[in-house]
Amino acid sequence: MNPLIASASVIAAGLAVGLASIGPGIGQGTAAGQAVEGIARQPEVDGKIRGTLLLSLAFMEALTIYGLVVALALLFANPFV
């Protein structure tokens, strides 16, 4: 294996995980803050807000998992070799 390709794959894997987690991390923090604010305003709709929050957090977390899958593919099933 070419050492240049191997090192570029490791750097690309790190960037894939790092960049794939920035957006969902910011989004999850914003969504959780807004959910807490909404529950504080209207405590009677607590269950509905919490359910919607958990569903949206799962969709946001999927983006980070996709970045992890790309990184694992670059590290262990390198298509550039």
Swiss-Prot record:
Annotated InterPro entries: ATP_synth_csu_bac/chlpt, ATP_synth_F0_csu, ATP_synth_F0_csu_DDCD_BS, ATP_synth_F0_csu_sf, ATPase_proteolipid_c-like_dom, F/V-ATP_Csub_sf
PROSITE patterns (alphabetical): ATPASE_C
Main location: plastid
UniProt keyword Oxidoreductase, yes or no: no
Topology of the protein relative to the lipid bilayer: Multi-pass membrane protein
A GO MF term: proton-transporting ATP synthase activity, rotational mechanism
Subcellular location, record wording: Plastid, Chloroplast thylakoid membrane
Site (described: Reversibly protonated during proton transport): 61
GO CC terms of this entry: chloroplast thylakoid membrane; proton-transporting ATP synthase complex; proton-transporting two-sector ATPase complex, proton-transporting domain
Pfam families reported in the protein's UniProt record: ATP-synt_C
Family annotation (SUPFAM superfamilies): F1F0 ATP synthase subunit C (SSF81333)
Entry keyword Ion transport: yes
Transmembrane segments annotated in the record for this chain: 3-23, 57-77
Record's keyword terms, sorted: ATP synthesis, CF(0), Chloroplast, Hydrogen ion transport, Ion transport, Lipid-binding, Membrane, Plastid, Thylakoid, Transmembrane, Transmembrane helix, Transport
Extra facts: In plastids the F-type ATPase is also known as CF(1)CF(0).
Function: F(1)F(0) ATP synthase produces ATP from ADP in the presence of a proton or sodium gradient. F-type ATPases consist of two structural domains, F(1) containing the extramembraneous catalytic core and F(0) containing the membrane proton channel, linked together by a central stalk and a peripheral stalk. During catalysis, ATP synthesis in the catalytic domain of F(1) is coupled via a rotary mechanism of the central stalk subunits to proton translocation. Key component of the F(0) channel; it plays a direct role in translocation across the membrane. A homomeric c-ring of between 10-14 subunits forms the central stalk rotor element with the F(1) delta and epsilon subunits.
Subunit structure: F-type ATPases have 2 components, F(1) - the catalytic core - and F(0) - the membrane proton channel. F(1) has five subunits: alpha(3), beta(3), gamma(1), delta(1), epsilon(1). F(0) has four main subunits: a(1), b(1), b'(1) and c(10-14). The alpha and beta chains form an alternating ring which encloses part of the gamma chain. F(1) is attached to F(0) by a central stalk formed by the gamma and epsilon chains, while a peripheral stalk is formed by the delta, b and b' chains.
Homology family: Belongs to the ATPase C chain family.
Identification of the protein by name: ATP synthase subunit c, chloroplastic
Source organism of this protein record: Chaetosphaeridium globosum (Charophycean green alga)
Lineage: Eukaryota, Viridiplantae, Streptophyta, Coleochaetophyceae, Coleochaetales
Gene name linked to the record: atpH
